[in-house]
């Protein structure tokens, strides 16, 4: 309920701010209001639809097998561990799935805390000790308990709305400026679309940096939550184990942001969804 209230308050503040800016710039409030409504429908609507379909997309993209009846002792242990952590975290039991992949990875997704999905790769099960797998599960359960998927989707939706609205408004300003010169031709339909799409791409890059910054913050928070559901030592051991492998994530792009990502360099660091393993271990050791 708090998250929904915060979301509504945020959008109200955005509407008031944009209304003030439009008044100061002397823009037509009626056309701007219609554009803002369209941007909100596409920006926020697209983000929420993606969230609603996230479990289905994740299962299809990874070929994950949801454990309903355990086929072996490992699957039985996974269900038991997740059930215990869910009870400790005060959330509903999520679906637990395993997907085929050589790399050690895991992710959590879902629209509601009480109806989420936790999936681990076969590579993670083979490559980690039971204590380390328990810590990884605790990390993913912390994401669910913290409502990270919903929070990031709301942030993405607000930024999507900004990107669509500002790119169209900037294209309108350019078109009006060109229409007022001696030729008076303006951009034309295709020119307007090309400029707005280019601006959307540029603004979208900056929006992605903001989303990824929030994502990195949520990773530290989930690591901290894992220390309460498992232990600090187990979480550090799991991250140290990941350092020993050359991480090359096989997760499909649709769910890559939810899993463990290889380290990149330069400007690519701004687009990372996860902090470096070194930074995460250092943060845990400082607790």
From Swiss-Prot:
This is Protease HtpX homolog. Zn(2+) binds at residues 139, 143, 219. HAMAP family: Pept_M48_protease_HtpX (MF_00188). One of its GO terms (molecular function) is zinc ion binding. Its cofactor is Zn(2+). One of its GO terms (biological process) is proteolysis. The lineage of its organism: Bacteria, Pseudomonadati, Thermodesulfobacteriota, Desulfobulbia, Desulfobulbales. The active site is at residue 140. Its EC number is 3.4.24.-. Binds 1 zinc ion per subunit. InterPro entries: HtpX_protease (IPR050083), Pept_M48_protease_HtpX (IPR022919), Peptidase_M48 (IPR001915). One of its GO terms (cellular component) is plasma membrane. The chain crosses the membrane at residues 4-24, 35-53, 147-167, 194-214. It comes from the Bacteria. Pfam families: Peptidase_M48 (PF01435). It is a multi-pass membrane protein. Belongs to the peptidase M48B family. Keywords: Cell inner membrane, Cell membrane, Hydrolase, Membrane, Metal-binding, Metalloprotease, Protease, Transmembrane, Transmembrane helix, Zinc. It is found in: Cell inner membrane.
């Amino acid at each position: 309920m708090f998250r929904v209230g915060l979301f509504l308050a945020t959008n109200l503040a955005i509407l008031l701010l944009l209304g003030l800016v439009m008044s100061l710039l002397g823009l037509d409030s009626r056309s701007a209001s219609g554009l803002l409504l369209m941007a909100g429908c596409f920006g926020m609507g697209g983000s929420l639809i993606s969230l609603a379909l996230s479990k289905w997309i994740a299962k299809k993209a990874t070929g994950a097998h949801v454990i309903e009846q355990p086929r072996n002792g490992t699957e039985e242990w996974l269900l038991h561990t997740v059930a215990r952590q869910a009870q400790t975290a005060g959330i509903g039991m999520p679906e637990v799935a395993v997907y085929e992949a050589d790399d050690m990875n895991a992710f959590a997704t879902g629209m509601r805390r009480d109806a989420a999905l936790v999936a681990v790769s076969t590579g993670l099960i083979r490559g980690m000790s039971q204590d380390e797998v328990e810590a990884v599960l605790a990390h993913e359960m912390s994401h669910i308990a913290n409502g990270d998927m919903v929070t990031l989707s709301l942030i993405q939706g607000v930024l999507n709305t900004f990107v669509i609205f500002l790119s169209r408004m900037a294209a309108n300003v350019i078109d009006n400026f060109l229409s007022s010169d001696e030729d008076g031709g303006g951009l034309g339909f295709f020119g307007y679309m090309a400029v707005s799409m280019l601006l959307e791409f540029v603004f979208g890059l900056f929006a992605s940096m903001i989303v990824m910054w929030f994502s990195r913050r949520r990773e530290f928070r989930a690591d901290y939550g894992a220390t309460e559901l498992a232990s600090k030592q187990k979480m550090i051991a799991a991250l140290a184990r990941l350092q020993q492998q050359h991480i090359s994530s096989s997760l499909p792009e649709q769910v890559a942001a939810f899993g463990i990502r290889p380290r990149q360099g330069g400007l690519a660091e701004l687009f990372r969804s996860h902090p470096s393993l070194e930074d995460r271990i250092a943060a845990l050791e400082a607790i």
